[in-house]
């Protein structure tokens, strides 16, 4: 299990774009399960939609990608690198996510060759499917300052 400080030591995302609160399970280089507690105070609810708050689907996909980045970047060989989003295939949204929901984010790395790879992401709320997608990624080095 990884807490928020451990997650922040692995991936560079920060508020308001850090969309993973905890990693519950992790198998190095293979898979992870994370959670995002969706609060009524999320900044995106101010405009999406004020009278009927719904978490934007693209942010659910981003949360899955961040869990995938933790899987990839927590290994010693990739520590200190960046994981870039390279593509999305077969993405489907099945249910709305609203304030008070807890998103369970499961990502499995399907294949990785060199710095390119693909994973499968599944997001659920209370055991009900919210989103499923295939995520492509590219690993890169951080630029020198």
UniProtKB/Swiss-Prot annotation:
GO cellular component, as recorded: cytoplasm; membrane
Function: Involved in unsaturated fatty acids biosynthesis. Catalyzes the dehydration of short chain beta-hydroxyacyl-ACPs and long chain saturated and unsaturated beta-hydroxyacyl-ACPs.
Protein EC: 4.2.1.59
InterPro entries named among the record's database cross-references: FabA_FabZ (IPR013114), FabZ (IPR010084), HotDog_dom_sf (IPR029069)
Subcellular location: Cytoplasm
TM region positions: none
Top-level taxonomic group: Bacteria
GO MF annotations in UniProt: (3R)-hydroxyacyl-[acyl-carrier-protein] dehydratase activity
Keywords of this entry: Cytoplasm, Lipid A biosynthesis, Lipid biosynthesis, Lipid metabolism, Lyase
Record-annotated active site: 48
Family: Belongs to the thioester dehydratase family. FabZ subfamily.
One Gene Ontology biological process: lipid A biosynthetic process
Pfam families on file: FabA
Protein name: 3-hydroxyacyl-[acyl-carrier-protein] dehydratase FabZ
Catalytic activity field: a (3R)-hydroxyacyl-[ACP] = a (2E)-enoyl-[ACP] + H2O
